[in-house]
């Protein structure tokens, strides 16, 4: 028998699915999965940087400068048919050397939009998109 609740297992399966999808589709803004353990509900990924939260605390960055990059990777995930649904500064990772952005923590990722958007990040990237539509 397992010591995990059904909900924990569902969240783990959800997250594992996204990491495996990213590996299969070679999605560059999701860290590569290195290993996983279904019994212990552990997923190991390549270390690609630090959270945007830690980066901005430590390096003193302007979050607004990163909105276009966050919008790009968020919209790419949506194009694959999934909403992150937990988009927060701690779930956006940045490589401090080249400022490449990644998304992590896919427990709540779903084909339906259900983000509580507690940090207003989805609202910010959506608002900036509408006001700066580019003609193609």
List PLM regions with ranges.
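Conserved hydrophobic alpha-helix
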Residues: 73-77
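Hydrophobic residue at the +6 position relative to the catalytic HRD Asp in the kinase catalytic loop
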Residues: 87-94
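Conserved structural core of kinase catalytic domains
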Residues: 8, 23, 29-66
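ATP-binding glycine-rich loop module of kinase domains
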Residues: 1-16, 20
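Residue-level recognition of conserved beta-strand positions in structured domain cores
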Residues: 1-3, 35, 46-47, 105-106
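C-lobe/activation-segment region of protein kinase-like
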Residues: 66, 79-83, 95-136
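Short, glycine/acidic-enriched loop or turn micro-motifs at the edges of active sites
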Residues: 49, 89, 108-110
């Amino acid at each position: 028998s397992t010591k995990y609740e059904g909900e924990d297992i569902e969240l783990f399966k959800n997250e594992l699915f996204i990491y495996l999808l990213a590996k299969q589709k070679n999605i560059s803004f999701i860290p590569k999965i290195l290993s996983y353990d279904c019994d212990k509900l552990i997923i190991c990924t390549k270390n690609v940087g630090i959270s945007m939260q830690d980066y901005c605390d430590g390096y003193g960055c302007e979050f607004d400068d990163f909105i276009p990059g966050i919008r790009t990777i968020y919209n790419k995930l949506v194009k694959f048919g999934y909403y992150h649904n937990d988009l927060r500064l701690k779930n956006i990772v940045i490589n401090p050397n080249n400022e490449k952005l990644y998304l992590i923590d896919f427990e709540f990722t779903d084909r339906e939009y259900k983000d509580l958007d507690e940090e207003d990040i989805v609202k910010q990237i959506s608002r900036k998109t509408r006001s700066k539509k580019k003609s193609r």
